[in-house]
């Protein structure tokens, strides 16, 4: 048991949509790089740990109205980094993702350039999971649903 492990704040998002053919729901999943130390190679919902920049940016773009501020912003950032999808924007150009991942542009600039209209009513808090205490690295993860 490792009860003294510091919990790492993180956020995960389940992006769902109606299937165009089957009348069921489709859920976005991504495959993690095999060299990542936590769940490497697994298929997962987009998500990750809160970065320091998330704290400042969540205030500047008014993510705090949801009561989850930095966690909502983290979920937004992670789904974009991992899949290229900008929630609240139709068909954001791939160039933004490539530029962000190569540190040529900040997420703040992506938000501005893509004219993202945040509709936080569609990002619904869904669950909170904490990694069991027998793991050496533990996360306090909030899950959000977005359609």
Report residues per predicted region.
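N-terminal leader/linker segments that precede catalytic domains of diphosphate-processing enzymes
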Residues: 1-147
């Amino acid at each position: 048991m490792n009860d003294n492990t510091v919990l790492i704040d993180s956020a995960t998002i389940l992006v769902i949509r109606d299937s165009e053919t089957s009348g069921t729901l489709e859920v976005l999943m991504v495959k993690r790089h095999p060299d990542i130390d936590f769940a490497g190679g697994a298929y997962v919902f987009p998500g990750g740990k809160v970065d320091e920049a998330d704290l400042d940016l969540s205030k500047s773009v008014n993510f705090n109205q949801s009561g989850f501020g930095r966690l909502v912003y983290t979920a937004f950032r992670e789904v974009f980094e991992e899949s290229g999808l900008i929630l609240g924007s139709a068909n954001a150009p791939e160039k933004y993702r490539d530029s962000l991942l190569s540190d040529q542009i900040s997420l703040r600039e992506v938000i501005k350039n893509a004219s993202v209209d945040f509709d936080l009513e569609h990002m619904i808090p869904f669950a909170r999971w904490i990694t069991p205490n027998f793991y050496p690295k533990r996360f306090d993860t909030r899950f959000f649903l977005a359609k």
